[in-house]
Regions:
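Non-catalytic DNA-recognition/assembly elements of restriction-modification systems
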Residues: 1-31, 35-36, 62-91, 211, ...
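Non-catalytic, well-ordered alpha-helical scaffold segments
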Residues: 21-25, 100-103, 140, 178-182
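Short histidine
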Residues: 33-56, 60
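Short coil/turn segments at secondary-structure boundaries
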Residues: 38-44, 61-66, 94-102, 120, ...
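Low-complexity, Lys/Gly-biased intrinsically disordered segments
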Residues: 77-114, 131, 149, 205
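A short beta-sheet element
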Residues: 107-108, 124-186, 195-198, 203-205, ...
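Cytochrome P450 core scaffold surrounding the K-helix E-X-X-R motif
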Residues: 115-119
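Interdomain signal-transducing alpha-helices
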Residues: 181, 189, 222-225
Length: 243
């Protein structure tokens, strides 16, 4: 009898975990299509944000990107990662080149969804030019190039660190809500828009990343969306933590 009850509890737990996962996916769907928070007609149109970066900016045509099957609000705009971010990968380990200063760096094994595992940190030499290219500062968005392609987290620490060549570092060209774009990558990953047929199966190259088409809301709505997702996800995480 007790075994049956325990089995039923375990089944209910698995069903609830699956429901929470599905709910999170739905929240992201609504967020990325502009349906999670109310549209404010007084918000500055997103195209003005893009024109502050590049006065000659023209919205992207997403019609050729067959996996994107949702519309966006009128005051949003389709752009590319390259329109919004400066980005590059880190340094490849090269034991035959010892030039530079020994510095801590992270690899894809340190980078997980929305967190970092920093118990094991390696070092390698970086020249001055490599430091500028590979340094990660607080607020930078880091993306896995290979392995679990598109896995992402924001570096929120008060100290800098370096990255190796299988991590993309994204840094906004102007003031943006990086957390909105973090959730955008999570949404794209769930829908196989990165790491699947949407881009390259074997990895996310710098070129693929640069040309990745994304929906961009106004700056205010970026923050509103990110804070709403944070709130909903934290409540769902509390439910699963109590199982």
């Amino acid at each position: 009898k007790w075994n049956i009850i325990i089995d039923e509890i375990e089944d209910d737990k698995l069903e609830l975990e699956a429901y929470v996962k599905k709910t999170k996916s739905k929240i992201l769907d609504l967020a990325i299509s502009g349906k999670l928070v109310p549209q404010d007609p007084n918000d500055e149109p997103a195209i003005e944000l893009l024109k502050r970066i590049n006065p000659d900016f023209e919205p992207c045509d997403n019609s050729h990107y067959e996996n994107i099957e949702f519309d966006i609000p009128q005051n949003w705009v389709w752009a590319t990662i390259g329109d919004i971010f400066e980005h590059n990968t880190g340094k490849a380990l090269n034991a035959s080149n010892p030039n530079g200063t020994m510095l801590d760096y992270i690899t894809t094994s340190n980078l997980y969804w929305d967190r970092f595992e920093l118990s094991i940190i390696k070092q390698m030499p970086f020249t001055e030019s490599e430091i500028e290219r590979c340094i990660v500062r607080k607020g930078d968005l880091l993306i896995c190039e290979g392995g679990d392609v598109g896995r992402a987290a924001i570096w929120e620490y008060d100290y800098n660190i370096m990255i190796q060549n299988h991590i993309h570092r994204l840094r906004g060209k102007v003031d943006i809500c990086t957390r909105y774009f973090f959730y955008l990558f999570m949404h794209y990953k769930l829908h196989n828009l990165i790491g699947g047929k949407g881009v390259a199966i074997q990895g996310l190259s710098s070129r693929d990343l640069h040309n990745l088409i994304i929906p961009v809301p106004s700056l205010k709505e970026q923050y509103d969306i990110a804070s709403s997702i944070d709130l909903y996800f934290s409540k769902l995480d509390m439910i699963t933590a109590e199982l």
